[in-house]
């Protein structure tokens, strides 16, 4: 199955249709805009916490002409939900999945990542049980572990863009695209 999350391109259209597609496809799993899934296999447990990152970024909430649904989401309620999920997560692996990166080697402006660091990133670092944050948005592959951090930040997206010179960041382990 595909465990889906919305991204900025979905917010240009009918975001509820992305959620509702779960009723059409047996492979598409997205019961709501943010949700959790526990997978157990061979004695190992994995908790996926899938989040809707577009409403966490101020520029999307402010641009209601292009992203009409972003300003209607209660992003603080979502962050509170993530905090509660992480407070009780006891699985062997805890992986948080969203569309936008918290850290990235890119030439894109920093405002989105600064918003992500101040919102979701703050909560992830508060809890010592998060193993990995997986996202897309940048259109290449990256692995980052910030110095002193225990979370692996993985950007796993369609490598449709060649890597352009971006601002070097501490902790970049790998970048290809």
Can you say where each PLM-predicted feature lies in the sequence?
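Extended active-site neighborhood of metal-dependent phosphoesterases/phosphodiesterases
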Residues: 1-90, 109-132, 139-177
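Short acidic, glycine-rich surface-loop motifs adjacent to enzyme active sites
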Residues: 89-106
């Amino acid at each position: 199955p595909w465990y889906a999350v919305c991204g900025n391109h979905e917010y240009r259209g009918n975001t509820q249709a992305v959620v509702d597609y779960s009723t059409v496809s047996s492979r598409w799993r997205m019961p709501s805009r943010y949700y959790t899934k526990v997978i157990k296999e061979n004695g190992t447990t994995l908790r996926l916490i899938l989040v809707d990152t577009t409403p966490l970024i101020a520029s999307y909430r402010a641009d209601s002409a292009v992203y009409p649904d972003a300003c209607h989401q209660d992003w603080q309620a979502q962050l509170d939900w993530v905090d509660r999920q992480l407070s009780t997560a006891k699985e062997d692996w805890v992986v948080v999945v969203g569309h936008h990166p918290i850290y990235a080697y890119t030439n894109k402006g920093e405002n989105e990542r600064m918003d992500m660091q101040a919102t979701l990133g703050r909560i992830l670092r508060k809890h010592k049980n998060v193993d990995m944050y997986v996202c897309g948005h940048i259109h290449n592959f990256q692995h980052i572990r910030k110095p002193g951090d225990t979370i692996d930040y993985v950007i796993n997206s369609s490598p449709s863009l060649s890597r352009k010179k971006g601002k070097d960041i501490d902790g970049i382990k790998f970048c290809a695209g």
